[in-house]
């Protein structure tokens, strides 16, 4: 099995080119999109005023219409889809580009306003749509588009017609197909058998051609398995690696059982028994004496305990309440399928296979694996990075970074390897990936060595090594390809990448935009002339990302 295909989750790549103008945070710095010849990241003192924050954005874009090339008034081209205040007091807004009322796929703009000053814009907008002759009425129906997608899944993926589950509603979008935007249907095909899949299809609304497709594993829909009413208790059990853990449970006097239901964190943490089937979520895990020492219990003990650790990490370190920021319940299913060699976040819950005992142990036994997958959930609710090409590699890297930081937070034999606790149990020192030395497992550690093929959604598990190495260097320091990097420690590195993920990245961000986002995040947190900003630049220089 290709270990790069493990730990899957959700990528158009928009080529970017950086053009900094001045060193001060108050002077403009731009990252240009090479494909569309428009800015994809602008920071500095962009515009001041007493208008509402969104009005500043519209005014600035109208003022710079020759640069952004939106055509017409900005308020007619952008729809405000999100607005919040971050921990620094900045007003952060997300806008979606529209063409005659139809959303432009992946074209999201993030704007920051602080004390009446527009300080940054991040995201790729598609220019000059008004100059193109774009159809806004489909020649094929929704039903036809869905049938085309399902048939392609059967022909190319499952080799049989999958038992499709309810997915995201099919919708019309303007899809940036290369340099030729066109009207398309976005179709979601979800299924659990014969293998789990959550495919996104772009179907040309004119002729039914498949324009693009990718497997976005983190968006399936579970059902059943209700919480129980009862008293919060503390149980004890043994995990996959044989270590003892105390876990929060719930005793139901009505049923006379203790359940893996933790009522102390957010809306609860629930762990289910899949019973080696592929129906989610399974049965809420029950035990007669609140002691979970049977070998069959081990995967559930770890899934339950580590979900709590991940919740605590995001709450205590980043002030984030669960993966959605609003204390959503965390649900996990263990013993999924038979010998299933994977784990995944499906948009609503965690799913863990038992492994085959040779390539993998039960996946919930790796705390970095649990942190990795739940971070995909955080990404889903923030940047929404498309799981393909460079945006998908950033998605994977974010999960590796925060999975590793969770492991250090819990101080459970922490290191910079990914999946080392559950991968190839018969081979000492083996792992899925390495952040400190990506080349150790065949992954690139420099942009010049990136994978440019189409396998693995454009190398999402491979090219993540480039960003992993940058994060490692930012934390620990070192010399890489002749570039010296001053380390700033894990905590600051995590703060910078978290802020970049939550407040600057957009669905189609690529590596250059990630660099700009991390530089801006470091400037926000530590000052524009700080060592932290310099170290971010050094780390990305060292891996060839500019």
Curated annotation (Swiss-Prot):
GO CC annotation: extracellular region
Subcellular location: Secreted
Residues that hold Zn(2+) according to the record: 372, 376, 396
Pfam families in alphabetical order: FTP, PepSY, Peptidase_M4, Peptidase_M4_C
InterPro entries, per database record: FTP_domain, PepSY, Peptidase_M4, Peptidase_M4/M1_CTD_sf, Peptidase_M4_C_domain, Peptidase_M4_domain, Zinc_Metalloprotease_M4
Binding site for Ca(2+) 2: 368, 415, 417, 420
Cofactor(s) required, per the database record: Ca(2+); Zn(2+)
Family classification: Belongs to the peptidase M4 family.
UniProt-annotated binding residues for Ca(2+) 3: 413, 415, 420
Keyword Cytoplasm set for record: no
Gene name linked to the record: npr
Protein name per its UniProtKB record: Thermolysin
An individual GO BP term: proteolysis
Signal peptide: 1-25
Cofactor: binding details: Binds 4 Ca(2+) ions per subunit. Binds 1 zinc ion per subunit.
Active site: 373, 461
Binding site for Ca(2+) 4: 423-424, 427, 430
Positions with a binding annotation for Ca(2+) 1: 287, 289, 291
EC number of the protein: 3.4.24.27
Enzyme class: hydrolase
Disulphides: none
Keywords in alphabetical order: Calcium, Hydrolase, Metal-binding, Metalloprotease, Protease, Secreted, Signal, Zinc, Zymogen
